[in-house]
Curated annotation (Swiss-Prot):
Name the record gives this protein: Acetyl-coenzyme A carboxylase carboxyl transferase subunit beta 1
Summary of subunit composition and partner proteins: Acetyl-CoA carboxylase is a heterohexamer composed of biotin carboxyl carrier protein (AccB), biotin carboxylase (AccC) and two subunits each of ACCase subunit alpha (AccA) and ACCase subunit beta (AccD).
Location of the protein in the cell: Cytoplasm
Region (Disordered): 289-308
Cofactor(s) for this UniProt protein: Zn(2+)
């Protein structure tokens, strides 16, 4: 065997070994680009163990890892989107719905589950960003109202994880109406004295950020989540000024008082559970103290001046 044949044989052996690695074993961090073992990333709740970047998470997995194991009831499964306007852009809306359902495995962009959090009854919902950018249409609005009604019926708190590009343009005014519809539903929840905790994940934009996502009794942001109404470029072109570094990120919003706290996804169950326990006066042995970590500065309220 010649030296060239030996090299080619080794090359074929290496390539065959590479080909034998199953697909989906490795994934790359979207921030630091570190190659990660996918099973380890899943155990870490889609948070990069190298740089702590919070990657986007599937709505169903988010709810399943957030709520207690055991009986969970999914609400609003009978609701499916309809093309009432016969809308068409480069594609028919009906075709877009079918494609989104096939790629995401969900019927629409919001999943609602009723279950328990640290032994306390709770209704939780989460946006599925892979379904047409988590856009809010009639079904999303109707499912959110069902979540509110279930919380009222069971006299428990409501938690929502938002990840959306805004209102769904293919449903025109019907999608914009969901902003008022969801806001009115939350008003009914508030009238009953029940808490609504809104968790804003990356990204939360447009009509969702301008309605239900910012109406929480407590608004929580995930680290470095993009949160806002219009996009950065649109704002810069409108005001004709450069925006500050980190504009529309959760850290910027916390600094300027737009959200109440930033919570690492891996601590979300305990932190939200502690808040729910306090807001509902529920004593659960599974709830631990939610005091700030030693690295966090305590919040202080400035004294009012003489003018009040």
């Amino acid at each position: 065997m010649s030296w060239l044949e030996k090299i080619l044989e080794k090359s074929n052996l290496v390539s065959s070994r590479k080909a034998s690695i199953p697909e989906g074993v490795w994934t790359k961090c979207t921030s630091c680009e570190q190659v990660l073992y996918h099973a380890e990333l899943e155990r870490n709740l889609e948070v990069c163990p190298k740089c702590n970047h919070h990657m986007r998470m599937k709505a169903r997995r988010r709810l399943e890892t957030f709520l207690d194991e055991g009986e969970r009831v999914e609400l609003g499964t009978e609701l499916e989107p309809q093309d009432k306007l016969k809308f068409k852009d480069s594609k028919r809306y009906k075709e877009r719905i079918s494609a989104a359902q096939k790629s995401s495995g969900e019927k629409d962009a919001l999943i609602v589950m009723q279950g328990e959090l640290l032994g306390m009854p709770l209704v939780a919902c989460a946006f599925e960003f892979s379904f047409m950018g988590g856009s809010m249409g009639s079904v999303v609005g109707a499912r959110f109202v069902k979540a509110v009604e279930a919380a009222i019926e069971n006299n428990c708190a409501l938690v929502c994880f938002s990840a959306s590009g805004g209102a769904r343009m293919q449903e025109a005014l019907m999608s914009l109406m969901q902003m008022a519809k969801t806001s009115a539903a939350l008003e009914r929840l508030s009238d009953k004295g029940l808490p609504f905790i809104s968790v804003l994940t990356d990204p939360t934009m447009g009509g969702v950020s301008a309605s239900l996502a910012m109406l929480g009794d407590i608004n929580i942001g995930e680290p470095k989540a993009l949160i806002g109404f219009a996009g950065r470029r649109v704002i810069e072109q409108t005001v004709r000024e450069d925006l500050p570094e980190g504009f529309q990120r959760s850290e910027f919003l916390l600094e300027h008082g737009a959200i109440d706290m930033i919570v690492d996804r891996r601590e979300m169950r305990q932190r939200v559970g502690g808040l729910v326990a306090k807001l509902t006066n529920h004593k659960s042995p599974m709830v631990v103290s939610v005091n700030e970590s030693p690295n966090e500065e305590p919040y202080s309220v400035p004294e009012a001046d003489e003018k009040g």
